[in-house]
């Protein structure tokens, strides 16, 4: 099979590999589509956490089950079905798993980071991680189920409620999902902050009231000039410390900040006294948080969540270098580079 493999920072190869054999309780999936996430780019650059080289990246995917190893009693009902699946492979036995937080598993394995992921024609995955797709949801659109689940989890943790004014910082693939989920839940996205003009334009098309660049102080200046834009909730998706500091400054007293993006290579000064003085609530979220079923259902409805503006540039897997370069440069209107593995 064809596979993209990351071997070391900024060293990737397009290889022929044997089709993997599913272990008991695992399925073999024929991958259809996989999109490139910001975390994949950090992994490529070697500035991520909890991973090991060499690894096949990819965790935003869709595909078709071709085989199930039923030695542990799993039935074969998913064979031939189109599916998506959770990257989180938890042990089920540690204290974190016992608390119902498998994403914090002490023995966590993640597809595309510590286990080979979906940038290959075939991938193995625990059967319990799979979610079948309804006929109404195409494989192309379904590769965005995982980022939608991430957004649903994050917006829920941040407590967005009907009537809330919401600011979103960062309008990449996750940021654009966050703003759509916030609107779906009845929030008003008053402002989106994003450095790339084409991504700002997409945010405007998807319903943001106002747009601003992400230069330091721009969002604070806009909110000071237009107090009606002051957010009840800020969803910070860029991962930059300066952005978090600005979120603390612009959110209303008693407001809430959801931390979704993070960059392990970035550090910066903070003024945390404002958290206490303004009585703010900060909540971090990590991964899809068990929201795959909700994401599949919402995306299949086809009315509240638009994925086509996110799927901006399609590539065959052999063109991985161009796909990665475009995603890293964020030029030519790139929101998401994605691979069609059946073309």
UniProtKB/Swiss-Prot annotation:
Q: A Pfam family matched by this chain, by name?
A: ADH_zinc_N
Pathway it works in: Metabolic intermediate biosynthesis; 2-deoxystreptamine biosynthesis; 2-deoxystreptamine from D-glucose 6-phosphate: step 3/4; Antibiotic biosynthesis; kanamycin biosynthesis
Per UniProt, where does Zn(2+) 2 bind?
91, 94, 97, 105
Which reaction equation describes what this protein catalyses?
2-deoxy-scyllo-inosamine + NADP(+) = 3-amino-2,3-dideoxy-scyllo-inosose + NADPH + H(+); 2-deoxy-scyllo-inosamine + NAD(+) = 3-amino-2,3-dideoxy-scyllo-inosose + NADH + H(+)
Known cofactor(s): Zn(2+)
Free-text comment on the cofactor? Binds 2 Zn(2+) ions per subunit.
InterPro entries assigned: ADH-like_C, ADH-like_N, GroES-like_sf, NAD(P)-bd_dom_sf, PKS_ER, Zn_alcohol_dh
What's an example Gene Ontology biological process for this entry? Answer: antibiotic biosynthetic process
Coiled-coil residues: none
EC annotation from Swiss-Prot or TrEMBL: 1.1.1.329
Q: Which UniProt keywords apply?
A: Antibiotic biosynthesis, Metal-binding, NAD, NADP, Oxidoreductase, Zinc
Q: Which residues of this UniProt protein bind Zn(2+) 1?
A: 37, 59, 146
Q: Which GO terms describe its molecular function?
A: metal ion binding; oxidoreductase activity
Domain of life assignment: Bacteria
Q: Please report which protein family the annotation says this sequence is part of.
A: Belongs to the zinc-containing alcohol dehydrogenase family. DOIA dehydrogenase subfamily.
Q: What does this protein do?
A: Catalyzes the oxidation of 2-deoxy-scyllo-inosamine (DOIA) with NAD(+) or NADP(+), forming 3-amino-2,3-dideoxy-scyllo-inosose (amino-DOI).
Q: What is this protein identified as?
A: 2-deoxy-scyllo-inosamine dehydrogenase
The organism encoding this protein is Streptomyces kanamyceticus
Q: What is the lineage of its organism?
A: Bacteria, Bacillati, Actinomycetota, Actinomycetes, Kitasatosporales
Its gene? kanE
């Amino acid at each position: 099979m064809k596979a993209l493999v990351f071997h070391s920072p900024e060293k990737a190869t397009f290889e022929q590999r044997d089709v993997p054999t599913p272990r008991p309780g695992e399925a073999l999936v024929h991958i259809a589509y996989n999109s490139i996430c910001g975390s994949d780019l950090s992994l490529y650059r070697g500035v991520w956490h909890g991973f090991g080289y060499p690894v096949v990246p990819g965790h935003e995917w869709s595909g078709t089950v071709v085989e199930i190893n039923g030695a542990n009693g799993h039935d074969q009902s998913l064979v031939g079905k189109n599916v998506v699946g959770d990257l989180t492979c938890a042990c089920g036995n540690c204290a974190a798993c016992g608390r119902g937080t498998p994403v914090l598993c002490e023995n966590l394995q993640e597809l595309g980071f510590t286990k080979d992921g979906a940038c290959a024609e075939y991938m193995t995955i625990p059967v319990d991680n799979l979610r079948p797709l309804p006929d109404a949801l195409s494989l192309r659109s379904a590769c965005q189920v995982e980022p939608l689940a991430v957004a649903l989890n994050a917006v829920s943790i941040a407590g967005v409620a009907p009537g809330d004014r919401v600011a979103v910082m960062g309008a990449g693939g996750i940021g654009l999902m966050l703003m759509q989920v916030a609107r779906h839940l009845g929030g008003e996205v008053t402002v989106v902050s994003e450095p790339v003009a084409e991504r700002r334009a997409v945010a405007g098309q998807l319903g943001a009231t106002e747009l601003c660049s992400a230069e330091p102080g721009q969002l604070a200046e806009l909110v000071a000039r237009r107090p009606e834009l002051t957010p009840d909730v800020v969803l910070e998706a860029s991962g930059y410390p300066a952005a978090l500091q600005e979120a603390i400054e612009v959110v209303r007293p008693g407001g809430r900040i959801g931390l979704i993006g993070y960059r392990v290579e970035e550090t910066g000064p903070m003024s945390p006294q404002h958290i206490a003085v303004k009585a703010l609530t900060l909540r971090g979220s990590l991964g899809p948080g068990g929201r795959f079923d909700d994401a599949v259902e919402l995306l299949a409805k086809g009315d509240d969540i638009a994925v086509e503006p996110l799927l901006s540039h399609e590539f065959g897997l052999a063109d991985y270098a161009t796909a990665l370069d475009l995603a890293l440069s964020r030029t030519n209107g790139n929101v998401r580079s994605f691979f069609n593995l059946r073309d």
